[in-house]
Every structure is written in structure tokens, then in C-alpha cells.
């Protein structure tokens, strides 16, 4: 059974105020005292089922599962063999978190227990001032979190909470929503449950004018303004990439938790949270898989305005199309082995996919710093106007992660699909056609 303490960690991660006198980054909390190659993702599917009660009050079904958890929390020890007794869970958790508070950080949440070992009905985090209701076995009750006062712990979770005077809003308007049935592993918790940061993003986006496009930059600015207000030390400020997107990795420095988010909305991705290390995140993960071209709508290419930009993109695609045709017709060319084309792809899409695979030497799904060099040489040699070349790679890297995905390459070249059709408006037909890959001669531009 999952320890309730783990359910509250992401909640508290959002509530903890940042340390004022020191700057942190995601790399600050990378684990350095353990073997970098240490694997905490053991497969325990076939392990013998012999329950163990750990020092934090959790029951592990096998020694393998315990070792997997201990890998992430070296302080964890085996208390005794067999299932943990429910009556002692609160006491065990309290003892464990008190030890954590002494050794790690003072802001850790420490539960309150009744004389019979069950959890007290009201639990509070003194460092942040938030209180909420729990069941006798420690499960948080949804919708009961309030700031700087004692919540009404209902017989029914649907009972209304007290309202602020004159506002008509409940006290938990800015508080995180708590769940009554937590499920999942420890590494899931910070992303599976709504964090205060998520709730803040939702709140700010709801206040945004419906006619305007919400972006990370706007949320970042709003968070900075909120942080200036009295008693708003718990505001979490999102990290932003270029183009109004969120950085794929978001972290809370005070606790060392990091998680992956959808770059267009900032919402956490379930199952991605880690502690004291950066998770591996998809730089293109989106809530709404948008047309790649939309990311570049209105995006300025420095030194290459309007008609010059159109001329430049046309020359790049024209040269790439010609190179693909020549590669396909030259048996000695290492790049001539073309994969079977997707029948739904237009010529320009086939060209971009072909060239992307050519550059992506390690098949990682993106073009890294070293792999991008041939593309830069290609642009300098075969495209015009030359003024458009200088900043084009930076223009393509819309999320500023120093690499280019196939979606970014298609988008910055203006060939992303829109309603099932490629964006080929106003563009001249490329000089060489990929029909030669089907044993047909390339059609010359008339």
C-alpha cells in the first residue's frame, strides 16, 4: 500500500517557497554521491513474493521492490518481515519524516497521529500554512485544503468549504486538489497528482483573455507578479523556452523534484517525476499536437523578412529535392537507399524526412549540435539570399534545446500539413522530383 506521505510530496513541492539567498537550477540537485550508472528501475515482475515492512511504514511485496525504493532513498531500511500494521503506519511515518527533517531539509511534512496510531483528522504543514482533512488511514480528502486556518472536515467530501468574506470563493481556490484514492509508484506521484504549480497555471490561464494566446512567458510574468504579493511565497515560477513554450523539464529547487511537462500547456506528464536528477523528457510533447507550421507563424527570421524569406525557403527545398533525386539515382551513394515513402506524404514532406534521416546519424530522433554542421554547410553553399542563412538554425530550434526535431525542420521549412494538405502555397515546384525514386525521370521546372 502506498504511504500517504508520498501522496503529499508533490503537493508540498509546490507549496514550499524558494530559498531566497541562492539561485538554483535543475542541475543543482543532480545526484553526485552515487554511481551515475546505478539503475533504480529494477524489473521485479518475477521476484518471490515475500512482504517486507520498511522503516517509512510502507509494505513492499518483495525484496526486489524494497531494493528499488532504497536505491532512490538510501535511508530506507527494513523494519521487519511481513506486512506493515496499519495501526502503526502513522507512527512509523512520523518517525521517518522527523529523521528526514533532521538530516535533509526542515520543510518536510511531518504527520500528526492519534493515540491509537491512526492519522489525526486534520493535517497541517506548518512551513507553508496549509491544512487539509484525511481519513483515519491517512488518505487526503479531496477539496479540503485551506491556507492559514483549520479546514472543516466533512462527513461527506461534498460538503462545501467556508468562503472568504466578500469574495464568494472557497478558501481552497488557490490550493491544490487532493485525491482520495492514490495509485501508482513513488516515481509517479509528483506528476500523477495535481501540484500547486499546475493549479496556478490553470488559474492564470483561466484569467487570460479568451482572444489572446496564453504562453509560458505570460504565465512566468504573472507568477512573478503574484510572488510580489503578501503571503504569496509559495508561488512557483515556470521555466520558459523561446516561442512562448514551456521548457520540457520543470523543477522545484527546494525539494529537488523534477518532472516532464507538455511544452504547450505546461501540464505535468504522468510517470516522469524524479528526485535529485533530471528526467528524460520529450522536447516536442504537446497537449494538442499542433501543426508544426503554426509554431513559426509570425516568427521572425533575423535579416530575412517577407519575400526574401519565401525565396530562401524555396531555394532550400529546391536544392534538397534535387539532392534526394540524385542520391536515389546514384547506386554508389550511401544516402541513395531511400525508405519506402509514405503515400500520404507530399513531395516536400518526403524530402524533409529523407534529409532528416541523413543528418540523424545516431537515430536519436533529433539533430544534435554535431549533426547540424552538415546542414549549416548545405545552407551556406546551396541557398539564397545568403543573409537568411546566418540565423536559420536558431530560427528552426523553436524550443531552444540546441537540437532540431523532424517536426521543427518541417515547420521552419514551411511544409507542415494543414488539414491534410501540405503548405505548398506560393511555392515554386522544386527542380527535381522524387518521382525518380519510382524509376521516373525528374520533371524539370518549366
Curated annotation (Swiss-Prot):
Compositional bias per record (Polar residues), positions renumbered to this chain = 206-216
Region described as Disordered: 147-228, 416-446
| Binding annotation for Ca(2+) 1 | 360, 362, 364, 366, 371
Q: Which GO terms describe its molecular function?
A: calcium ion binding; extracellular matrix binding; heparin binding
The residue stretches assigned to a coiled coil in this entry are none
Chief localization: secreted
UniProt-listed Gene3D superfamilies? 3.30.60.30, EF-hand (1.10.238.10), Thyroglobulin type-1 (4.10.800.10)
| Domain Thyroglobulin type-1 residues, every copy | 87-153, 213-281
* Subcellular location as annotated: Secreted, Extracellular space, Extracellular matrix, Basement membrane
Keywords for this protein: Basement membrane, Calcium, Disulfide bond, Extracellular matrix, Glycoprotein, Metal-binding, Repeat, Secreted, Signal
Q: Which range is the signal sequence, renumbered to this chain?
A: 1-21
Instruction: State the PROSITE patterns in the record.
Output: EF_HAND_1 (PS00018), EF_HAND_2 (PS50222), KAZAL_2 (PS51465), THYROGLOBULIN_1_1 (PS00484), THYROGLOBULIN_1_2 (PS51162)
User: Which CDD domains does the annotation name?
Assistant: EFh_SPARC_SMOC2, KAZAL_FS, TY
Listed under GO biological process in this entry are: extracellular matrix organization; positive regulation of angiogenesis; positive regulation of DNA biosynthetic process; positive regulation of endothelial cell chemotaxis; positive regulation of endothelial cell migration; positive regulation of fibroblast growth factor receptor signaling pathway; positive regulation of mitotic cell cycle; positive regulation of vascular endothelial growth factor signaling pathway
Q: Which amino acid positions bind Ca(2+) 2, per UniProt? A: 397, 399, 401, 403, 408
| Record has Isomerase as a keyword | no
Keyword hit for Signal = yes
- Residues forming the EF-hand domain are 347-382, 384-419
Q: Where does the record place the Kazal-like domain?
A: 34-86
Q: Which Gene Ontology terms of cellular component type are present? A: basement membrane; cell periphery; extracellular space
Subunit structure of this chain's protein: Binds various proteins from the extracellular matrix.
Role description: Promotes matrix assembly and cell adhesiveness. Can stimulate endothelial cell proliferation, migration, as well as angiogenesis.
Designated name of the protein: SPARC-related modular calcium-binding protein 2
Organism field: Homo sapiens
Question: Which gene name belongs to this protein?
Answer: SMOC2
Amino acid at each position: 500500500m502506498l504511504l500517504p506521505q508520498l501522496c503529499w510530496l508533490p503537493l508540498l513541492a509546490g507549496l514550499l517557497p524558494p530559498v531566497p539567498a541562492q539561485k538554483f537550477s535543475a542541475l543543482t540537485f543532480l545526484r553526485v554521491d552515487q554511481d551515475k550508472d546505478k539503475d533504480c528501475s529494477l524489473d521485479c515482475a518475477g521476484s518471490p513474493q515475500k512482504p517486507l515492512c520498511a522503516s517509512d511504514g510502507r509494505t513492499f511485496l518483495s525484496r526486489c521492490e524494497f531494493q528499488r525504493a532504497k536505491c532512490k532513498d538510501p535511508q530506507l531500511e527494513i523494519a521487519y518481515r511481513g506486512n506493515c500494521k496499519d495501526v502503526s503506519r502513522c507512527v512509523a511515518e512520523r518517525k521517518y519524516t522527523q529523521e528526514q527533517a533532521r538530516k535533509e531539509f526542515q520543510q518536510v511534512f511531518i504527520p500528526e497521529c492519534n493515540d491509537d496510531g491512526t492519522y489525526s483528522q486534520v493535517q497541517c504543514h506548518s512551513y507553508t500554512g496549509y491544512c487539509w482533512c484525511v481519513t483515519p488511514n491517512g488518505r487526503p480528502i479531496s477539496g479540503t485544503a485551506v491556507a492559514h486556518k483549520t479546514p472543516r472536515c466533512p462527513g461527506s467530501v461534498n460538503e462545501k468549504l467556508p468562503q472568504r468574506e466578500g469574495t464568494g470563493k472557497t478558501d481552497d481556490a488557490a490550493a491544490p486538489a487532493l485525491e482520495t484514492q492514490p495509485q501508482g509508484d513513488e516515481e509517479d506521484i509528483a506528476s500523477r497528482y495535481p501540484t500547486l504549480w499546475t493549479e496556478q497555471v490553470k488559474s492564470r490561464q483561466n484569467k487570460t483573455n479568451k482572444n489572446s494566446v496564453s504562453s509560458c512567458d505570460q504565465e512566468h510574468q504573472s507568477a512573478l507578479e503574484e510572488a510580489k504579493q503578501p503571503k504569496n511565497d509559495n508561488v512557483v515560477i515556470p521555466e520558459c523556452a523561446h516561442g512562448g513554450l514551456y521548457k520540457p523539464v520543470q523543477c522545484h529547487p527546494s525539494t529537488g523534484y523534477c518532472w516532464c511537462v507538455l511544452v504547450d500547456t505546461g501540464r505535468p506528464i504522468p510517470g516522469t517525476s524524479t528526485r535529485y536528477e533530471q528526467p528524460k523528457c520529450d522536447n516536442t510533447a504537446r497537449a494538442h499536437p499542433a501543426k508544426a507550421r503554426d509554431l513559426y507563424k509570425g516568427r521572425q527570421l533575423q535579416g530575412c523578412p517577407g519575400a526574401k524569406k519565401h525565396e530562401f525557403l524555396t531555394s532550400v527545398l529546391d536544392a534538397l529535392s534535387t539532392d534526394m533525386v540524385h542520391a536515389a539515382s546514384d547506386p554508389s551513394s550511401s544516402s541513395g537507399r531511400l525508405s519506402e515513402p509514405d503515400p500520404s506524404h507530399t513531395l516536400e514532406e518526403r524530402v524533409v524526412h529523407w534529409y532528416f534521416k541523413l543528418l540523424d546519424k545516431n537515430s536519436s530522433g533529433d539533430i544534435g549540435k554535431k549533426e547540424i554542421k552538415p546542414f549549416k554547410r548545405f545552407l551556406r553553399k546551396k541557398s539564397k539570399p545568403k543573409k537568411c542563412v546566418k540565423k536559420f538554425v536558431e530560427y528552426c530550434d523553436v524550443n531552444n534545446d540546441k537540437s532540431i526535431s523532424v517536426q521543427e525542420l518541417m515547420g521552419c521549412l514551411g511544409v507542415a500539413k494543414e488539414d491534410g494538405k501540405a503548405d505548398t502555397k506560393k511555392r515554386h515546384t522544386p527542380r527535381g522530383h522524387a518521382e525518380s525514386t519510382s524509376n521516373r525521370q525528374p520533371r524539370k521546372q518549366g
